[in-house]
Amino acid sequence: MTAQPTDRTTPLLLQGQEYVFRAPIAALDFQERVHRLDLVDPGDGEPEPCVLVLARSADMEMNDLSIALAEFGVRMARIDIDRCLDVSLTVYPDAPLIELDRWVLRPLLVWRRHFELAALPVDPGTLYGAYVADQWRSVADWITNRADWAQVNSLATGRQPDRMTQLTDAAMFGLRTPRTVVTTRPARHRPGGGACVVKTSGRHLVEPSSGVQHGLFPRPLDPRNGSGAPEPAPVLVQQYLHSDYELRVFVVGEQLIGYRVDKLDPAQLWVDPDAVEVRAVEVPPALGTTLLALTRFWRLDVAAFDLLMTDDVPVFLEVNINCDWRWFERRSAEPSGTDAAPVSLAVATWVAQRFAQLRQA
């Protein structure tokens, strides 16, 4: 019988977490829709070079990218994890070709992001659900690791740097990091000797059923719970550091795009986004050099770094590979009334240029 939490055993990061996001499931990809409606030239029957994206339907960054790549004349095809149960797909092991619906495609560049098995609209506790999830896991891993085509964020398709590896590597490259411990007994630890926060060792959003995401946001460690029971799963206990503001740095190829983020607590970005102030800033040159070096070390092409700025000293928190940028662009542009989208433009340009390089190879 599966154990269920009681009031006493509810994990710290599930206590008082009221943020729930319901991800819409709909075909919003521009290129997919115009191809289904036969609004484009069907071509001569030869395999069409393309960018293949494995995502989910609510990935608005990829919806925007589809439009931008169409303007560049680049074909983008897509498999969404939450809409894949009825997809017509054939992937050939002996040729770099796929048949997606009624199109024969030659992927040159593959980008996998937000393609989480938890978003599959099946019950993993049933035989059918376990079967479907296992098949898609195997095939998606194979597609994103094949040598027949290039990948965006090569390391992310294999061994993605976990939170602790990120902290270790960042310190190795000279960045300051908060003192951290991984434990099932958070009440027993005070890394740094003072106030601490408890963080998830995994994702910030957990999806117990397809399309329903619950927040797992950092929370202060209550010193009054010194004799607390063990957690059912390890968490991060991290030294609390006072900061002047947070810095989000998007890395796109060799380009750096920075945003200053002023918020009252870590969860505010999700639970009260209208109260968060965001503005574009220049990335300090020395910090930028270090972040680019880390990006190359991790073999990343598009990623976002989160840092605290404490007395003008950057403190590394994490790198986000499945990073979302539209909210930062929109929020920073609101005061001026502009529609500036520097990250979106940088990503679309980088993908189009990489596609052109691969096509000429």
Feature-to-residue mapping (PLM):
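Phosphate-binding site of ATP-dependent enzymes
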Residues: 69, 191-292
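Short acidic-glycine loop/turn motifs at beta-strand connectors
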Residues: 73, 93-94, 251-255, 310-312
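Short hydrophobic beta-strand segments
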Residues: 44-57, 198
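Conserved N-proximal alpha/beta basic substrate-recognition cap immediately N-terminal to
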Residues: 11-28, 56-72, 77-177
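Short N-terminal or domain-adjacent regulatory/targeting segments
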Residues: 2-45
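A short glycine-rich, hydrophobically flanked beta-strand micro-motif that places a catalytic Asp/Glu
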Residues: 247, 300-311
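Loop-centered beta-sheet repeat module
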Residues: 159, 165-210
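C-terminal active-site "lid" helix and adjoining low-complexity regulatory extension at the edge
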Residues: 3-12, 16-18, 282, 296-297, ...
